[in-house]
Amino acid sequence: MNFQFYFLIKHNFISCKLETPLQLLLTTYVNLLKHKKNIIPLNVDKARDVYRAHENSYFLDHYIRSNQATCITQRPSVKLGEWVQKGDFLCDTTASSAGELALGKNILVAYMPWHGYNFEDAILVNETLIIYDIYTSLHLEKFEIEIENTNWGPEIIKLSDWMFSDKRDSLYGKELFTQETTKQTYVKEKQITIGVLKQAFLRRKGKLLINRRFISKIHKYEFLTNQRFVVPQFRYQQTLFQQINKNPKKQLISRSIIENSNQLSIYNKPKIRFTNNVISSKLFKPLIIFSQVTLLNILSQCHIDKSQYQPTSELLSSKLVAKEQIHELLFKQPKKTGVKIKLKHGTSHTTDFYNKDLLSNTKMRAGGENHRPGESKIYLGSKASVKFINMNFQEKKTNGYKKISLYNNKTSSQNNVNKKSFFLFLNKSILFLNKPRPKYKSTRPVNVSLNKSAFIYRRSFRTLFPYNFKNMRLSCEKLFVNNNNWLINYIKSLDVVIGGEIYRPGNKLQINLEYLNFKYGFVQKNNYDHLDNDGIIKLGTWVKPGDIIVSKLRPIGPHNPTPLEKLVAAILKKKFDDYKNAAFYTPKDVYGRIVGIEILEPKNLPSDVEYSGIGRVEFYLVDKRRIFVGDKMAGRHGNKGIISNILPKQDMPYLPDGTPVDMVLNPLGVPSRMNVGQVFETLLGLAGKYLHQHFKVTPFDEVYGPEASRSLVYSKLYEARLKTDQNWIFDPKSPGKTRIFDGQTGANFDQAVTAGYAYMLKLIHLVDHKIHARSTGPYALVTQQPVRGRSRAGGQRLGEMEFWALEAFGASYNLQEMMTIKSDDILGRTQVFDSILNSKPIQNSHPESFRVFINELRSLGVNFQSQILHQYNPNIKTKI
């Protein structure tokens, strides 16, 4: 809201009216000019007409951004009908009060040590300063997005129909299916079935990676109503989990990280029943939905080529997800065989998944080549041995997570039965399989490589490969055996096999697979809902790092598509896009609300060029920041410090009258720095608090007499003592000091403490602008050493004196790491992760700076040859 001043001039007197639209409606008659000799009652309209020529208007600024990205706001300091004259101030700004400079606040401070929290000028703060927003500041950030000219034309700001269709909400459980006819083939606009991913937005470190639709073609299906199934709610969080890829460098970082999965919701949606009795991989290519560590699995059955393989194991994947209780997600087919699922908090449900034709041709045999005692092999035959598997889920408390006990029931009379493998995914990302045979149980950890399939080869089966190529593969980090249960910990990424072939040339097994990899989780639906139809963020939207501000598209011109792009284009029946995504994202460590948007027209564009009508977009984002541990504060005497801790009000030291201290300062910061003025300020502020007086002390007041400052302070303290009848304000035995009580114990401290009101300021050096951490990051091009600075994600850099310290301590291994693999050893920093993961010794290498030094000598004409001697055999030499 803009405030406007109206000044009406009459006989050198100026009267002002602070006018807002609300006041114009409520105030119809106001006496603007009143004086002893000139009393002229006027209403607003008449005053404007009579004194139109002498009217001056001033508009106040609100939420203006300063050069330091702080907020400047002007507020009126005059009232309606008040007389003003030349030189009187009309309004205050953010940094003024009653026309005087005011950058801080008067708060109660005490100079005393407190459990070491004010070591080295650190500051202890009361939480009331945060609760009442005493030092809360507003920060305005400005972002500019320019429209650039490329060789293929100008960029455009818009929502692409290819990436952001109006029906994108159907992804998230709102409109998965249509029911136009009872039977229909695949329709492009209505393109999702259970387990088929419609559209995947993948994000890493705030950058949009892929905007493509992956659709599986279903030949024939029909719709049934009133079927309940689970649909994930996509909630994006910028965590380290989304930043992990197949690079072995990131494996060590993610060792101890186990992300909780996203919650699941239940919707009533139509059920799909396939017209085919067998859901084979030829007709159904399941693309699995994977959100962080939550896997929404689907029903899948193997398609086996009998001419090439005899030993086989049917992999049956049940779709079970646990939230607080385990909900079913199932298909139903009219068959006698099936799986009985007993829920702890519900009734039993029987699901019929089995391929009747396949089971009828399966029987168990023992013996044969490479047979172990007690091991069963599956061969294709004429008889079948069918069983019911009763999975009773019982919740147990083990190591803080839910544990599922899985056992078999209602088996046939035969000893050797056809066992199936079940994959159960809980909300703690724990995967359990059937128990292996007791004779072959193991307790040692088993390492699984990232690219190895997560379908476990049980010893009871002679399995060459998970034959369902069209199914999914899981990439995991750690596989171990616990209580005879296979357990996969921390599911890391998901590979979806979309094609492939398998054949056996001679006695060797050759497998060619083509798969998609989803590594980083999915972006939430709201990331695009806050954009308007033009692709620009809406005013008033709250944003966080990584959110899209402007959806900008950049022309890319002709290019050679990759095989994956050709596959996606063939599935979607789309032509290759002429634009690529160049969206602008909220920068790192930026939180706040969009409070201003300015759209400027483009310049210097040819008239025949089509553009979106936008040349530059400017955004203003406001952020409210309270004081926090690590922020810098200071007084008016150079007494600066960092906030070390924020204590509750009841734990802070308090005065004899029960007033808790707002801030505790280090008393050692006074004598050595010769700024005793802060002590006088504190005591005089205490006297002024109870006397309700405001003091202006002349600098160098000793010219008026010896010890003028001391005399003024003591006299005012004594006056305050007499006025309030509180003797602790001034004690003649220890003037300027008082007894302080401990807020935690209630006992008073042994020594008297200097306490009073001082003027403390919050500096612009905030911890949000300073804090920085890096594991691995960019390296300089020439020296190959970590770059410097927080803005460039710089790393740790050790200088000559730091190396001296390590040498003095004899930390040889740390010294080697700092000088080589953590600095500029290109080969060593790549091999060290492999050495740690595989429990191999770290090889010694040489830094890149040594190679640069040798090349500089050679550039000067000095031929310098160097060799590395072997650690144990000096005759073995290696050239550098």
Curated annotation (Swiss-Prot):
Assembly and binders: In plastids the minimal PEP RNA polymerase catalytic core is composed of four subunits: alpha, beta, beta', and beta''. When a (nuclear-encoded) sigma factor is associated with the core the holoenzyme is formed, which can initiate transcription.
Pfam family, one: RNA_pol_Rpb2_6
First and last residue of the signal peptide: none
PROSITE patterns noted in UniProt: RNA_POL_BETA
One annotated GO biological process: DNA-templated transcription
Any one Gene Ontology cellular component term annotated for this protein: mitochondrion
PANTHER family: DNA-DIRECTED RNA POLYMERASE I SUBUNIT 2
Record-given protein name: DNA-directed RNA polymerase subunit beta C-terminal section
Entry EC no(s): 2.7.7.6
Subcellular location: Plastid, Chloroplast
Keyword Cell membrane part of the UniProt annotation: no
Keywords on record: Chloroplast, DNA-directed RNA polymerase, Nucleotidyltransferase, Plastid, Transcription, Transferase
Protein family: Belongs to the RNA polymerase beta chain family.
